Amino acid sequence: MIKIAINGYGRIGRNVLRALYESGRDKNIKIVAINELAAPEAMVHLTRFDTSHGRFRYPVQLAGHSMLVGEDLISLFAEQDPANLPWRALGVDVVLDCTGVFGSRADAELHLGAGAGKVLFSHPADADVDATIVYGVNHQVLTGRERIVSNASCTTNCVVPVIETLHREFEINCGTITTIHSAMHDQQVIDAYHSDLRRTRAASQSIIPVDTKLAKGLERILPHFAGKFEAIAVRVPTINVTAMDLSITVRKKVTVTDVNQALQRASRGTLSGILDYTEEPLVSVDFNHDAHSCIIDGTQTRVSDANLVKMLMWCDNEWGFANRMLDTTRAMMAAG
């Protein structure tokens, strides 16, 4: 039995809990605790009702200082300092740190010092962590000695399996990526102050360029592409699901059919459950609650002069990523 604690019960934290239960209930993983500064009543309410993902089909209620999900009692804490959390007493094997705030080795060591066996960040972390994992691409590098791991980002998990597949087939020279990301909590409902002047503007009224470290994150997973990719990102007025526009140049001459068939083979083979492929006339909302890291829209693949390839891919940046958090947790524990 893998005992996990969730630190930070926001979008990803809640989706991890729901994904664990809705996937058919992995009997080998049990959530024993959640640490969140919000009111317990709000935590219960937002577990039961979700604007993007609908009603949770399991009953959820407060039970003293715990949350009862079905018949499972989950201890609730509201502790600012992770060093004060009772991970040792609870026998926590892995802390899923979903705060989006912590990301350094020193941050993770607070959980370890409190008795947790391992820590998995739900976001890009500093370079001094033991490993950064994109499940399906490099989770095999886990040896069991890693105690502090990052699950990278939703966009890294979306694009890296595609890049790795196409490089293996056609040898990529370089590329650019545009992330078209749904709005996030760090944006404003109406115009308000923010250190990033673009983010002072109402999220529902504009397409808003934002900074991204996606290219650097990609290099950490695929170091042979250091300096070969650049990325930009915009936020759009939707609340979930992200599109990614990938352009690459390849050494081998290719056609649209070559590219699409390579991705279809990967989706049926080594990347089954991670990569999906469609040629249906779908829009972003159709990928809501999709557990894949990436879904290729084969109708949008383009090839120019046999070497320049452009394609469109989708991901549910919440649900898909939450499922990868659970996959990486299993891989960390299976490694030892």
Swiss-Prot record:
Cell compartment(s), UniProt: Cytoplasm
Assigned EC number: 1.2.1.72
Residues annotated as catalytic: 154
Reactions listed under catalytic activity: D-erythrose 4-phosphate + NAD(+) + H2O = 4-phospho-D-erythronate + NADH + 2 H(+)
Binding site for substrate: 153-155, 199, 212-213, 235
Residues binding NAD(+), per UniProt: 11-12, 317
GO annotation, biological process: pyridoxal phosphate biosynthetic process; pyridoxine biosynthetic process
GO cellular component: cytoplasm
Site residues by UniProt (Activates thiol group during catalysis): 181
Family annotation (Pfam families): Gp_dh_C, Gp_dh_N
Keywords: Cytoplasm, NAD, Oxidoreductase, Pyridoxine biosynthesis
Pathway: Cofactor biosynthesis; pyridoxine 5'-phosphate biosynthesis; pyridoxine 5'-phosphate from D-erythrose 4-phosphate: step 1/5
Subunit structure, as described in the record: Homotetramer.
Protein task: Catalyzes the NAD-dependent conversion of D-erythrose 4-phosphate to 4-phosphoerythronate.
Family the UniProt entry places it in: Belongs to the glyceraldehyde-3-phosphate dehydrogenase family. Epd subfamily.
Protein name: D-erythrose-4-phosphate dehydrogenase
Native source organism of the sequence: Aeromonas salmonicida (strain A449)
Phylogenetic lineage: Bacteria, Pseudomonadati, Pseudomonadota, Gammaproteobacteria, Aeromonadales
